[in-house]
């Protein structure tokens, strides 16, 4: 029996000679350790290098996998990702590789407190996406996160208030004065005479980290988005929390345009390059309302929404 196993990727030339922009693997199941306190992702990874040597039959997939498996046992940081990309390129020096890219996708599990009930909290899952690329000696790292929130239509709210006002006037026509407790009781009985439509909504944001970034800070990105929107969906709730959520929605009426602009203003204070895509799953319509915006110098392209 021969002691040497054949390696046709090395010994047999390609019958079709052409360089390839990217070659590698995708949808690799792998656990990813985030920064201290950031938790762990049950992630799916994609990893590729370029293949400039047109005559070679293929790259060495196992080298990519082993590097990924070894390096991702340590917490992910910008420095770690930059080092991993360089190692991927160097592992294919015999292919003359000069570029590498890596994506990590998964759901970040965060425990979120209830709005009012002390000691009550629940889990939220946030889809996140980390993309790192090294090409021509330059490394870029992008983060993408998805946040769910509630949006209440400003127009529908105004129409509902008008109906409520008209009903109040009609039922109290001819009366010059009303006692405070009488008005309060009428509102208690008829305050839902008309209600504005609201819906679960989705925001996807992608940012490019500055070259000197020390941390990924995914939790910070999620927090910035939820702070800007003010109405993130909740996990565990009791009646006081549901009432507080209703108050937040009333204080933050939003068209899809408003949501996109809120996020743009918030992200512009922290990132030089970003892209925002929002989608309101309309309860009034059978279609969705969408909006996109980005930084003035963004070259990130659309999100994956």
Curated annotation (Swiss-Prot):
**Which Pfam families does the entry mention?**
GCHY-1
Site positions for May be catalytically important: 153
List, in alphabetical order, the GO biological process terms annotated in this UniProt record: tetrahydrofolate biosynthetic process
Cleaved signal peptide residues: none
Enzyme Commission no: 3.5.4.16
Give TM regions.
none
Q: What class of enzyme is it?
A: hydrolase
Query: Which InterPro entries does the record match to this protein?
Result: GTP_cyclohydrolase_FolE2, GTP_cyclohydrolase_FolE2/MptA
Q: Coiled-coil stretches, from where to where?
A: none
Gene Ontology molecular function terms on file: GTP cyclohydrolase I activity
Similarity comment: family membership: Belongs to the GTP cyclohydrolase IV family.
Query: Which NCBIfam families does its entry note?
Result: PRK13674.1-1
Q: What is this protein called?
A: GTP cyclohydrolase FolE2
Give the organism the record lists.
Xanthomonas euvesicatoria pv. vesicatoria (strain 85-10)
């Amino acid at each position: 029996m021969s002691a040497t196993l054949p390696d046709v990727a090395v010994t047999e030339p390609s019958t079709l000679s052409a360089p390839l922009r990217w070659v590698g693997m995708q949808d690799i199941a792998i656990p990813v350790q985030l920064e201290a306190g950031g938790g762990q992702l049950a992630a799916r990874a994609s990893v590729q290098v370029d293949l400039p040597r047109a005559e070679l039959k293929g790259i060495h997939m196992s080298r990519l996998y082993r590097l990924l498996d070894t390096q991702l046992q340590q917490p992910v940081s910008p420095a770690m990702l930059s080092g991993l990309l360089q190692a991927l390129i160097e592992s294919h020096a015999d292919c003359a590789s000069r570029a590498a890219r890596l994506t990590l996708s998964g759901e970040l599990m965060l425990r979120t407190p209830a709005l009012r009930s002390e000691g009550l909290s629940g889990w939220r899952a946030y889809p996140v996406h980390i993309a790192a690329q090294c090409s021509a000696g330059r490394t870029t790292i992008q983060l993408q996160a998805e946040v769910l929130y509630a949006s209440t239509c400003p127009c529908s709210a105004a129409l509902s208030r008008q109906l409520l006002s008209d009903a109040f006037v009609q039922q109290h026509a001819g009366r010059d004065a009303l006692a405070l407790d009488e008005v309060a009781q009428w509102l208690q009985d008829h305050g839902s005479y008309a209600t504005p439509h609201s819906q679960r909504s989705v925001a996807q944001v992608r940012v490019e980290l500055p070259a000197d970034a020390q941390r990924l800070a995914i939790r910070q990105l999620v927090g910035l988005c939820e702070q800007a929107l003010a109405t993130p969906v909740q996990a565990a709730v009791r009646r006081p929390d549901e009432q507080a959520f209703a108050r937040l929605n009333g204080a933050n009426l939003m068209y899809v345009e408003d949501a996109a602009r809120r996020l743009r203003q918030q992200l512009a204070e922290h990132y030089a390059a970003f892209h925002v895509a929002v989608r309101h799953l309309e309860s009034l319509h059978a279609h969705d309302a969408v909006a996109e915006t980005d930084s003035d110098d963004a070259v990130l392209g659309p999100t994956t929404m």
